[in-house]
Amino acid sequence: MSNVPADLKYTDEHEWVRTEADGTLTVGITDHAQSTLGDIVFLELPQVGKSVNAGDAVGVVESVKAASDIYSPVSGEVVAINEEATDSPEGVNGDAYGVWLFKLKLADGASTDKLIDAAAYSKLID
């Protein structure tokens, strides 16, 4: 059974989202995603300043088994990427919820309403 922290929101595509005190959103991939992918060997993340729409493929995670797109959970602007994660992508395998990938500033009118809670995500992956 995968770890699904209750304080985060999730997407059907296996990203987790944490709302920060300043209103930005921190995004990573879930424990289920890293477990399914296996040993992660490469991360391609979006450029800071890039405008993205909810559901856009914004990056790639590659493992020894497969490559999978990383999707933007909401519409907004990329305001930061985790360069430590790109330098040491295997860290995601060890701590999927501690190693974030990128941060977003919500676009005007965008919301997190379509994200799912931990209970719904747990049902999705069971």
UniProtKB/Swiss-Prot annotation:
Pfam families: GCV_H. One of its GO terms (biological process) is glycine decarboxylation via glycine cleavage system. Its cofactor is (R)-lipoate. Keywords: Lipoyl. GO terms for cellular component: cytosol; glycine cleavage complex. The keyword Repressor does not apply. The modification N6-lipoyllysine is found at K65. Residues 24-105 form the Lipoyl-binding domain. PROSITE patterns: BIOTINYL_LIPOYL (PS50968), LIPOYL (PS00189). Binds 1 lipoyl cofactor covalently. The keyword NADP does not apply. It comes from the Bacteria. InterPro entries: 2-oxoA_DH_lipoyl-BS, Biotin_lipoyl, GCV_H, GCV_H/Fam206, GCV_H_sub, Single_hybrid_motif. The glycine cleavage system catalyzes the degradation of glycine. The H protein shuttles the methylamine group of glycine from the P protein to the T protein. The glycine cleavage system is composed of four proteins: P, T, L and H. PANTHER family: GLYCINE CLEAVAGE SYSTEM H PROTEIN, GLYCINE CLEAVAGE SYSTEM H PROTEIN-RELATED. Belongs to the GcvH family. This is Glycine cleavage system H protein. It comes from Burkholderia vietnamiensis (strain G4 / LMG 22486). The lineage of its organism: Bacteria, Pseudomonadati, Pseudomonadota, Betaproteobacteria, Burkholderiales.
